[in-house]
């Protein structure tokens, strides 16, 4: 049962004036503006030199997100830094152990050993303290 039959009222219609011609003109202006901007961009692009790593270009060409590449790169660098830090700390501990053992074995060279270790950025352990091997 319709509303107009039960209430006795006639339905109201809203009408919109379709302005085809102005809409087409606006679209034409937008397309022309877009084309002009693309022409400007293509003319200025050769003058701008941006070095993009080929790996990122390959990611984009393979429809992959370059942010993923950046995240993976940062994670790899962090792992390598941790590994190198561990190696550096191990070498410092080895240097300290060798310096300590040399000071015990050749006490008359204590000053020379300390200078050599300190010159390379290391710290000489105090004589008399045993270090864990």
From Swiss-Prot:
Biased-composition ranges, Basic and acidic residues, are 15-28
Top-level division of the source organism's lineage:
Eukaryota
Q: Where is this region: Disordered?
A: 1-28
One BP annotation, GO: regulation of transcription by RNA polymerase II
Stated role: Component of the Mediator complex, a coactivator involved in the regulated transcription of nearly all RNA polymerase II-dependent genes. Mediator functions as a bridge to convey information from gene-specific regulatory proteins to the basal RNA polymerase II transcription machinery. Mediator is recruited to promoters by direct interactions with regulatory proteins and serves as a scaffold for the assembly of a functional preinitiation complex with RNA polymerase II and the general transcription factors.
One Gene Ontology molecular-function label: transcription coregulator activity
The protein's name is: Mediator of RNA polymerase II transcription subunit 10
How does the record describe its quaternary structure?
Answer: Component of the Mediator complex.
Question: Where is it localised?
Answer: Nucleus
Q: Bias category Polar residues: which stretches?
A: 1-13
- What keywords appear on the UniProt entry? Activator, Nucleus, Transcription, Transcription regulation
Q: Does the keyword Transcription regulation apply?
A: yes
Give the species this sequence originates from: Phaeosphaeria nodorum (strain SN15 / ATCC MYA-4574 / FGSC 10173)
A cellular component annotation (GO) from this entry: mediator complex
The record's similarity note reads:
Belongs to the Mediator complex subunit 10 family.
Major localization listed first in the record, in broad terms:
nucleus
């Amino acid at each position: 049962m319709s509303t107009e039959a039960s209430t006795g009222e006639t339905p109201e219609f809203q009408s919109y004036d379709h302005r085809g011609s102005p809409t087409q003109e606006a679209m034409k202006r937008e397309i022309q503006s877009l084309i002009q901007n693309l022409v400007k961009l293509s003319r200025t692009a050769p003058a701008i030199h941006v070095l993009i790593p080929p790996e990122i270009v390959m990611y984009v060409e393979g429809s992959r997100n370059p942010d993923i590449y950046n995240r993976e790169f940062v994670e790899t660098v962090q792992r390598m830094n941790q590994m190198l830090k561990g190696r550096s700390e191990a070498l410092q501990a080895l240097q300290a152990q060798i310096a300590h053992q040399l000071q015990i074995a050749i006490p008359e060279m204590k000053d020379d050993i300390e200078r050599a270790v300190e010159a390379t950025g290391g710290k000489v352990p105090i004589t008399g303290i045993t270090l864990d091997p």
